[in-house]
């Protein structure tokens, strides 16, 4: 059975939609979590290890305050949007988690992120989380995330 961390995990799964702007703000949209789609997490000696996020994984998940950032804040601690102040909104849909981030047009860092997404220099999203419950199928080498305890961030 592959390594199963007990702490925060990071996944790079989905794409951004084409961003839009209006007179006051820059808006980025995407789906950082996609349900029921196997993703290859790693390959070791030609063997693929996969992961699936189950469709009910976000039920009872703590999503009270998560942020949109860049590269999980590794080189840039900028918070681009946040659920707590409604600059980051989300919707759980049958396909996964949809987000909409409202960026500040007057902040150069926000404009740079928006431009990078618009020009597809940044075209994937990821998320960090803690698992509450999972299962593992040794025949298919697939871990299924059944429940996510807390969502920390979605990231460009």
Predicted regions and their residues:
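Short histidine-centered beta-strand/loop micro-motifs
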Residues: 42-43, 79-81, 113-116
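A glycine-rich, hydrophobic loop/mini-helix early in the fold
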Residues: 57-97
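Residues at the C-termini of beta-strands that transition into short coil/loop
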Residues: 34, 72, 155
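Polar/acidic, low-complexity leader/linker segments enriched in S/T/G and N/D
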Residues: 1-65
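Residue microenvironments linked to proteolytic maturation
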Residues: 12-14, 20, 25-27, 86-156
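Short, charged/polar surface micro-motifs in flexible loops or helix N-caps
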Residues: 37, 73-76, 105-107, 133
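Short, solvent-exposed polar/charged micro-motifs at secondary-structure junctions
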Residues: 41, 77-80, 136-139
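Short His-Asn-centered micro-motif
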Residues: 30-31, 70, 128-129
